[in-house]
Amino acid sequence: MEQVYSVTQVNNYIKNMFVKDYVLNRIYMKGEVSNCKYHTSGHIYFTLKDETGQMACVLFAGYRTGLPFRLEEGQSVIVLGSISVYERDGKYQLYAKEIKLDGLGLLYERFELLKRKLNEEGLFDPSHKKTLVPYPRTVGIVTASTGAAIQDIINISKRRNPYVQLVLYPAKVQGEGAAKTIVAGIKALEAKGVDTIIVGRGGGSIEDLWAFNEEMVARAIFDCSIPIISAVGHETDITISDFVSDLRAPTPSAAAELAVPEIESLLSNLVDYHYSLVQCVMRKITMARSELEKKQLQLTHLSPVYALRQKRQYTIDLENKLRQRMNELIRYKRHLLDIQIERLKAASPLDKLKSGFSYVSDSSGKVVNSITKTKPGDELTIAVTDGMIKAKTIGVESIER
């Protein structure tokens, strides 16, 4: 009968095969990280995969001290380790001892490190962002002299406002030395005194766009005294230049729209500003005229001639009022006098004489209005309407009533 082996024996046998294999005992493997998990023990468990296959991997805590970056999903890495069997599960896996970023992964890591460094230095702080010139006369462009980017910028700028001058600094935008020419372009346009600078290029891979992730370019943008618009690649492409620039445009075409205002809008604004200015000036003139008239009136009131005229008029008015009151008083008194005269007339003996009555008085002038006030022999005077009658009392006779 054939020999029968236990599962453990088979797993152990296979493990020994891996251990004795020179290639598998020390092997470099390249792939993309997925299913990355950090265990509480300090170990890192992850899967290394490519287009058609995958392998389980583990980096024990003792080897993590040599890992210069944080292992994350999607990173392209090269792993040094050994392949062996995990006997409990009967599965083989890569036991990693060293992990390095590879290709794109290394670029992404450099990107994140520089991004973190510049952010900590404050180069991305919004307080450092400069405001674009609203009505630029000159726009500088740092990009390649050939390609779609410069043509898009020229076409859109001329359509929006043909009076804005475009100044191109032909820079190398990818490959060796590209970052230096971009920095030189920024400094040259700053020295020329343009109003706004567009720094960018068309789309491409992360390697193609890498010049705009260089630290020297980021610092040149930050140190520039002129507002800079970053316009690198397409909307989904993000570079360090986008973070440090004063304004990010998703494309070079969008950058031209941001930098160059439409002339129709400018003309409309000018008409509005002219109308507002005229209205403002007219309001100020009206206010000034009103204030002048007010001051003139105040000066007139403070004039000695005006004061004398006012006093003279006051005197005339007072005189007229006094005369009016005097006339009213005279008329009133005359009216009272007329009343008294009428009363006196009504009581006057002379008026009664005209009615046929007479006035009798004795020799002493006392009125004789009773028989008791005279006696026979007394001389009397009888006053009538046209004179006096001298008479003597002959006798008196009482009349019964």
UniProtKB/Swiss-Prot annotation:
Keyword Hydrolase: yes
Gene3D superfamilies per record: 2.40.50.1010
Principal location: cytoplasm
Assigned protein family: Belongs to the XseA family.
Keywords: Cytoplasm, Exonuclease, Hydrolase, Nuclease
Summary of subunit composition and partner proteins: Heterooligomer composed of large and small subunits.
Classification via HAMAP family: Exonuc_7_L
Superkingdom assignment: Bacteria
This enzyme's EC code(s): 3.1.11.6
Any GO molecular function: nucleic acid binding
Name assigned to this protein: Exodeoxyribonuclease 7 large subunit
Taxonomy of the source species: Bacteria, Bacillati, Bacillota, Clostridia, Lachnospirales
Record localization: Cytoplasm
GO biological process, one term: DNA catabolic process
Cellular component, GO, one term: cytoplasm
Enzyme category, top tier: hydrolase
InterPro entries: Exonuc_VII_L (IPR003753), Exonuc_VII_lsu_C (IPR020579), OB-fold_nuc-bd_dom (IPR025824)
Keyword check for Repressor: no
Signal sequence, renumbered to the chain: none
Reactions catalysed, as given in the entry: Exonucleolytic cleavage in either 5'- to 3'- or 3'- to 5'-direction to yield nucleoside 5'-phosphates
CDD domains, alphabetized: ExoVII_LU_OBF
Function: Bidirectionally degrades single-stranded DNA into large acid-insoluble oligonucleotides, which are then degraded further into small acid-soluble oligonucleotides.
Pfam families tied to this protein: Exonuc_VII_L (PF02601), tRNA_anti_2 (PF13742)
